[in-house]
């Protein structure tokens, strides 16, 4: 629901699109590949 989710990917605030679309951009912002790679 936060604009920051989509803002990191498309460059403009995305409210529902970022979450509903699930393009993965929102996930990358919240969970960058660095920590994921280390934990895995």
UniProtKB/Swiss-Prot annotation:
Cellular compartment(s): Secreted
Pfam families for the chain: ANP (PF00212)
Any one of the GO BP annotations: regulation of blood pressure
InterPro entries: Natr_peptide, Natr_peptide_CS, Natriuretic_peptide_brain
PROSITE patterns documented for this protein: NATRIURETIC_PEPTIDE (PS00263)
GO cellular component labels: extracellular region
S-S bonds: 9-25
Tissue: Expressed by the venom gland.
Keyword terms of this UniProt record: Disulfide bond, Hypotensive agent, Secreted, Toxin, Vasoactive, Vasodilator
Family named by the database record: Belongs to the natriuretic peptide family.
Protein name, per record: Natriuretic peptide PaNP-a
Organism (species): Pseudechis australis (Mulga snake)
């Amino acid at each position: 629901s936060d604009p920051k989710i989509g803002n990191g990917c498309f460059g403009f605030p995305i409210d529902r699109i970022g979450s509903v679309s699930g393009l993965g951009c929102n996930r990358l912002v919240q969970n960058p590949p660095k920590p994921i790679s280390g934990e895995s």
